[in-house]
UniProtKB/Swiss-Prot annotation:
Pfam families the record matches: OTCace, OTCace_N
Keyword Glycoprotein: no
Protein name listed in UniProt: Ornithine carbamoyltransferase
Subcellular localization(s) per the UniProt record: Cytoplasm
Species name: Shigella dysenteriae serotype 1 (strain Sd197)
PROSITE patterns linked to this entry: CARBAMOYLTRANSFERASE (PS00097)
Length: 334
């Protein structure tokens, strides 16, 4: 694709609205081609390094399947499979991998790490997730929303994110809304709002693109008329146990449940989640939450909503692969 060749994919605001739209169009085409058996391999002979300082199911599988579909080969470097930042600097790692690979994916910690990789690798670098941003997830989310509201422009849609909005998902949603004009409402306790500077920047851009960004603590007001309600986990296994009670007390009123879905007043409202979700007690963490905090039947989302017809979370999960494929094809093929 013109203009994308050898570009990095580090955060959404590195792109223009037109470029973002082009990536979504390419993803939709690649998805249709795969389904119809007409996919054309554009990455034959390419070698791709996947650096994972944080484990992941969806991100790893998406990159691997997308690469294989397109004829590329991958090397997985897991949390214990490389010396990045420990025995070898990020700068040196970038220069080594850049001599061997045609593209590098990084999923891990600070945004400065993926930025340094991009500065020194000499090949396209893609952000699979950092503490600050999760751009590949938002590409999948935008494609999923387009599929479920065909014919509607993003500035005619309303997305609500309920819960902890100060994380990489909240930041990337702000950037997505800025570029698309998507009506975005972050419904969260004020302590869980993103940094004011990013909100201000993205709100100004969103208004230029016909959209609006709202932050509110009021659940009923925030979800009214929503087309999509989105949430993410409140706690993770890596966090100190003392944080769990504090986080749950802060966010309990922002659980996505049938009452919240009904408060939208939209019988066609859809539920989104980037996964994994703690919607039951069938996981180690889910059991702990149920036993210690009485969160039976779900934490950030109830099992009832997660398993309902309104839930399109597995469409999202599939679209991770198609949109990641679009990023690789756009940046590695002329």
């Amino acid at each position: 694709m013109s203009g994308f060749y050898h570009k990095h994919f580090l955060k959404l605001l590195d792109f223009t609205p037109a470029e973002l739209n082009s990536l979504l169009q390419l993803a939709a085409k690649l998805k249709a081609d795969k389904k119809s058996g007409k996919e054309e391999a554009k990455l034959t002979g390419k070698n791709i390094a996947l650096i994972f300082e944080k484990d992941s199911t969806r991100t790893r599988c998406s990159f691997e399947v997308a690469a294989y579909d397109q004829g590329a080969r991958v090397t997985y470097l897991g949390p214990s499979g490389s010396q990045i930042g420990h025995k070898e600097s990020i700068k040196d790692t970038a220069r080594v991998l850049g001599r061997m690979y045609d593209g590098i994916q990084y999923r891990g910690y600070g945004q400065e790490i993926v930025e340094t990789l991009a500065e020194y690798a000499g090949v396209p670098v893609w952000n699979g997730l950092t503490n600050e941003f999760h751009p590949t997830q938002l590409l999948a989310d935008l494609l999923t929303m387009q599929e479920h509201l065909p014919g509607k422009a993003f500035n005619e849609m309303t997305l609500v994110y309920a819960g902890d909005a100060r994380n990489n998902m909240g930041n990337s949603m702000l950037e997505a809304a800025a570029l698309t004009g998507l009506g975005l409402r972050l419904v969260a306790p004020q302590a869980c709002w993103p940094e004011a500077a990013l909100v201000t920047e993205c709100r100004a851009l969103a208004q230029q693109n016909g959209g609006n960004i709202t932050l509110t603590e009021d659940v009923a007001q925030g979800v009214e008329g929503a087309d999509f309600i989105y949430t993410d986990v409140w706690v993770s296994m890596g966090e100190a146990k003392e944080k769990w009670a504090e986080r749950i007390a802060l966010l309990r009123d922002y659980q996505v449940n049938n009452k919240m879905m009904q408060l939208t007043g939209n019988p066609e409202v859809k539920f989104l989640h980037c996964l994994p979700a703690f919607h039951d007690d069938q996981t180690t963490l889910g059991k702990k939450m149920a036993e210690e905090f009485g969160l039976h039947g779900g934490m950030e989302v109830t099992d009832e909503v997660f398993e309902s017809a309104a839930s399109i979370v597995f469409d999202q999960a599939e679209n991770r692969m198609h949109t990641i494929k679009a990023v690789m094809v756009a940046t590695l093929s002329k």
